[in-house]
């Protein structure tokens, strides 16, 4: 709804949302012991909000159904995906100003819808905190 008010021909695309803990364990086994472990929630510590169905990996499609450029692909496990360093990323040529503006648009519409961005992943948004999820919701096995 928020996106349609600003850009009627744009759409959101969901890449990942609810994730069973069984899948989380497989993902963790791929990254544990590597430099990429920090990008995947450890299932031994309760997993993440995807495991409660309370997180979404999302982007924006233009009027032709093409994803807007965001500087990296979804699930890029690296510094360029970070939202807190976007000015530096533009300054050093890692992402363009247009890509930064597209990220800002995504954050704007998702925040208006009640979601919070994850600083290390421009595509990831949480609906609530992990503590709130643990109190109110059940894990997806």
Language-model-derived ranges and their functions:
Residues 1-141:
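Cell-envelope/glycan interface and biosynthesis
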């Amino acid at each position: 709804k928020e996106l349609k008010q600003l850009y009627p021909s744009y759409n959101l695309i969901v890449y990942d949302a609810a994730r069973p803990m069984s899948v989380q364990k497989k993902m963790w086994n791929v990254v544990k012991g590597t430099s990429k472990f920090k990008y995947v929630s450890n299932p031994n510590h309760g997993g993440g909000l995807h495991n409660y169905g309370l997180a979404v990996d999302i982007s924006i499609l233009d009027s032709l159904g093409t994803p807007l450029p965001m500087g990296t692909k979804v699930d890029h496990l690296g510094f360029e995906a970070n939202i807190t360093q976007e000015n530096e990323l533009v300054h050093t040529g890692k992402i363009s100003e247009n890509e930064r503006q597209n990220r800002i648009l995504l954050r704007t519409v998702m925040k208006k819808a009640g979601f919070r961005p994850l600083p290390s992943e421009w595509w990831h948004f949480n609906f609530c905190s992990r503590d709130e999820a643990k109190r109110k919701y059940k894990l997806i096995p």
